[in-house]
């Protein structure tokens, strides 16, 4: 719908948030999906610059430019309507399905005739940064996602110049045997190097961690997570803690059918996640506990959308103290105005 245009993405989100009554004077930009550091540096500059430019414009200017951009894309064969786009691409899709073209060949045939004006110099980007310091909608955080093996000193310098404040990386496990069994092509030592670089360059770290991978078991998963949050080589600021779910297209399907991998029972999964929550230190936030995968697409594994609620109820039943950031937030416990006032008086 937005043609992967960062200006349009921001404009669309701002319109939706404003319509729902949200205040948008402070914005955290989160660029998810893909491997950010794999994109050419010129594209990274342009994409980031358009994020800032969309926030720097007035509401009227933003709406006007968004309309002009959508018209520009539609004239070049990228309509907003999904059915219209599918119809326009149908002949090429048929050739892809028949094995006559690869996806990349089809893309070049469809769109390479028009040069997309995606340009932003470092000076242009720095000017957008400075303008945003006094803009009505200010960026308070910029997050991108990449792989641990692409976290290098050079990549970190580029991220700092772009204005990034936090980096998401998919770790999944620190057990080298588990990593190898799941084709991760990386080691815990390289992950430790990536975490060290992120800290040295002043980034917050947000890692993705997965339980019930091929080769793991509940005991090893609990130990693996405990290492993540206690070993000084790691200690992330945030964690997305996911249970492994089987979808039809995954290679794990063969292992499932052969009986060499099975999903944890609900009792096993909840116990692993309970122990993970209890092990989480006070400087770490567990931001998510499931993936947004439709239950109809999951062949085996957790399908409960309220898994975190189930886990938190089990944590409460232990009567053990929870240090994890989200569990200690005022909103969770429903503090009264009097409680807040008393806290302010004590802090003063």
Where are these predicted regions, by residue range?
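Acidic, His- and aromatic-enriched active-site or binding-groove loops in soluble protein domains
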Residues: 52-61, 227-237, 265-266, 307-322
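Divalent metal-dependent hydrolysis catalytic cores, especially in the metallo-beta-lactamase
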Residues: 28-32
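Structural signal for hydrophobic packing residues in well-ordered secondary-structure cores
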Residues: 14, 18, 51-55, 59, ...
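Intrinsically disordered or highly flexible coil/loop and linker segments, enriched in small
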Residues: 19, 23, 60-61, 234, ...
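Conserved non-cysteine loop/helix-boundary elements of the Radical SAM core domain that shape
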Residues: 2-9, 33-53, 67-206, 210-267, ...
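C-terminal accessory regions of radical SAM enzymes
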Residues: 260-348
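Secondary-structure boundary/capping micro-motif
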Residues: 2-17, 22, 26-27, 42, ...
